[in-house]
């Protein structure tokens, strides 16, 4: 088992308070988040942005492994995840992955099947209880 951790510290009320988030790797260290970073365009990060980063990076790495297992090596995988938060429900309802990929010698059908498998089997996809969509474009 591999364990990774992050710590969040929140002070004050939900709307007026502020928080910081730090990761074990220290890539994030006392990074600010607040109501305004989550529900407006305030300076700092927010949980949904961090989930999007986790999903995009996990998917790209999983796709690389799946392509390799099928005998292909990607020149580049550019994945962007957009996480949707429904404030009325107070829940993440969707993560949409946009992918642009350069993979020599793979057919469009092979690529679509491999990308779909990676979408379903990526550990972050499995963690999310939300709709997950994939728009994959194979570049020449």
Residue spans of the language-model regions?
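Extended beta-strand/beta-hairpin segments
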Residues: 1-53, 60-140
